[in-house]
């Protein structure tokens, strides 16, 4: 039986790619899309996206209208406040949700975790296989290099239109390094005339052009350095991961999941 999905942020860059790949998957059915009220035209999802196979599928600003007909909500609205609201609505109806929106506060993440007591929730700042492998490799390297006099730094680059900085992926990397290295002092950008402190982890964000997403973790020692880099050249890597996550989470028990669970990492 196919997985019925609703995509929040259906007309955005990621939403469009998720829908495109979902249409190519025989195990997935797109039942509708959700957008901000200012972005919802008076036409259906098929007309909005130019997809004949989606003609008659609803496009609305009210997720609750579509929940009775869906198994999994894929949340890529790009708006953390809206995403929290969508997570609450979805889990109250005992439906699963996959969240790829980034930029959440710690309090918002705790809210989402609380919602997962009612229904399965998967939250990941990046759903590509490569980035999740980068998360794991960074953790392994940090464990080996801890107390070996190596400094850890993170740099990320994205297109000029990305709203949050640093990216959710960079912040996840920072979280992994901070916990593994037991260094809690995150420094966002550098300026001034002070030397680097031993307990720091630097996080740098660059914005420009059409860069889909580059992330590098640096382990900087004396006489050598290690660089772990992931470069995304297509949003399809993220979109494919979101579709696979939706297929995986259907029927799961209530709880809080990540892409590590999907990928078995």
Curated annotation (Swiss-Prot):
Reaction(s) the record says it catalyses: (S)-2,3,4,5-tetrahydrodipicolinate + NAD(+) + H2O = (2S,4S)-4-hydroxy-2,3,4,5-tetrahydrodipicolinate + NADH + H(+); (S)-2,3,4,5-tetrahydrodipicolinate + NADP(+) + H2O = (2S,4S)-4-hydroxy-2,3,4,5-tetrahydrodipicolinate + NADPH + H(+)
Give the subcellular location: Cytoplasm
Q: Name one GO cellular component term.
A: cytosol
Q: Name one Pfam family in it.
A: DapB_N
GO BP terms in the entry = diaminopimelate biosynthetic process; lysine biosynthetic process via diaminopimelate
Q: Where does (S)-2,3,4,5-tetrahydrodipicolinate bind?
A: 159, 168-169
Q: In which pathway does it act?
A: Amino-acid biosynthesis; L-lysine biosynthesis via DAP pathway; (S)-tetrahydrodipicolinate from L-aspartate: step 4/4
Using the UniProt record, give the first listed, main subcellular location: cytoplasm
Q: Which residues form the active site?
A: 158, 162
Molecular function GO labels: 4-hydroxy-tetrahydrodipicolinate reductase; NAD binding; NADP binding; oxidoreductase activity, acting on CH or CH2 groups, NAD or NADP as acceptor
Alphabetical UniProt keywords:
Amino-acid biosynthesis, Cytoplasm, Diaminopimelate biosynthesis, Lysine biosynthesis, NAD, NADP, Oxidoreductase
* E.C. number(s) listed in UniProt: 1.17.1.8
Report the top EC class in one word.
oxidoreductase
Q: Which residues bind NAD(+)?
A: 9-14, 100-102, 124-127
Say what the protein does.
Answer: Catalyzes the conversion of 4-hydroxy-tetrahydrodipicolinate (HTPA) to tetrahydrodipicolinate.
The record's family statement is: Belongs to the DapB family.
Instruction: Give the matching PANTHER family.
Output: 4-HYDROXY-TETRAHYDRODIPICOLINATE REDUCTASE 1, CHLOROPLASTIC-RELATED, DIHYDRODIPICOLINATE REDUCTASE
NCBIfam families according to UniProt: dapB (TIGR00036)
Q: What is this protein called?
A: 4-hydroxy-tetrahydrodipicolinate reductase
């Amino acid at each position: 039986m196919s997985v019925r999905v609703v995509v929040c942020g259906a007309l955005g860059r990621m939403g469009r790619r998720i829908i495109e790949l979902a249409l190519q998957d025989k195990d997935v059915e797109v039942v509708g899309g959700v957008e901000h009220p200012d972005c919802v035209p008076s036409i259906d999802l098929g007309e909005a996206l130019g997809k004949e196979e989606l003609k008659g599928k609803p496009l609305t600003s009210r997720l609750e209208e579509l929940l009775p007909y869906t198994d999994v909500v894929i949340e890529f609205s790009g708006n953390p406040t809206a995403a929290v609201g969508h997570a609450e609505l979805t889990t109250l109806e005992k439906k699963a949700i996959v969240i790829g929106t980034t930029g959440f506060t710690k309090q918002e993440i705790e809210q989402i975790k609380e919602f997962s007591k009612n229904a399965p929730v998967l939250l990941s700042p990046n759903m590509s296989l490569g980035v999740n492998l980068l998360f794991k490799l960074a953790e392994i390297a940090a464990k080996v290099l801890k107390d070996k006099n190596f400094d850890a730094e993170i740099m990320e680059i994205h297109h000029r239109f990305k709203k949050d900085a640093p990216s959710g992926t960079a912040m996840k990397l920072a979280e992994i390094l901070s916990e593994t290295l037991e260094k809690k002092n995150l420094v966002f950008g550098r300026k001034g005339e002070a030397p680097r402190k031993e307990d720091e982890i630097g996080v740098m964000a660059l914005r420009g052009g059409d860069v889909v997403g580059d992330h590098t973790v640096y382990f900087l020692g004396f006489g050598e350095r290690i660089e772990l880099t992931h470069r995304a050249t297509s949003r399809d890597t993220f979109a494919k991961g979101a579709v696979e996550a939706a297929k995986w989470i259907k029927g799961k028990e209530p709880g809080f999941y990540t892409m590590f669970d999907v990928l078995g990492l």
